[in-house]
Amino acid sequence: MAIFVTGDTHGSKKLGFFSVDGFMPRLNTESFPEQKSMSKDDFVVILGDFGGIWNNTETKEEAYALDWLDSKPFTTLFVPGNHENYDRLTGIDDADVLNNWMYSKLPDEEKKKLREGFPQKFWHGGMVREIRPSVLMLERGYIFNIDGCDCFAFGGARSHDISGGIFHPEKFKTSKQANAAYKQFEHHASFRINHLSWWQQEMPNHKEMQLGKGNLKKAHNMVDFIFSHDCPASDKTLLIGPNKPDELIVYFEEIKQNTIYKNWFFGHYHDNKRLSGGKDILLYEQIVQIN
């Protein structure tokens, strides 16, 4: 049995000719020949911005890509990043949102899926969302026993590509009103659209953060590996220089200072680097075996 780890995939396909994104080109047999000797008891962990769940409903293209991934000889695990459709992954808490014009034409079955998210189940010591039988999202704050290794998982990150702000189409009564207001946004340098290209659940809530601390305490603050999308505050400073830390990377820094671990793997910064004397590892397109 083996555990491999890789960085952001941003969906199933390449985003451009020179792109290293897309889980299909990255995890095909040509790019990842190790899979030829793997089984479903072997694992590939994607460190956030999986991007395989993006539209409001499952399209034929998305279904094909997820079925393709499920057909691979290994099990795919991912922590969520900041570019994920959390409405579909974990469900919409506010029922009134589903009465909005954005969702009014959806069949009742699709609305039910949006209310509940993907099926949740207990797996290897923690809670996961089952996207496909062998494609699982690791919920925040749990310690999973994977191939005999204790792995703390905590996805999420604050988006840094929203300098133009967040447009909220759900605040308008009709699509016509929303489209008229949208025209004021479309010339901004960089912005996202709530429920369509940005979701506030990209950042964890207090309950999830407390759950993570509690589970680490139960494990005497000792794990083998940590999987996240963003990184501890000190690592971010090493990567980009002085910055204003948000509550998540401060939380991670506290975990870093108080937890004994072998390696911390994260994505988000689109590079491949070793930090903190090699203990903390940023990954993008590289795929590395960790056990």
Q: What is each PLM-predicted segment?
A:
Residues 1-4, 135, 143-153, 225, ...:
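Beta-strand-turn-beta hairpins that frame and shape the catalytic cleft
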Residues 243, 250-258, 265, 269-291:
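Binuclear metal-dependent phosphoesterase catalytic core
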Residues 223-228, 260-266:
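Proline-aspartate-enriched helix->loop->beta-strand connector
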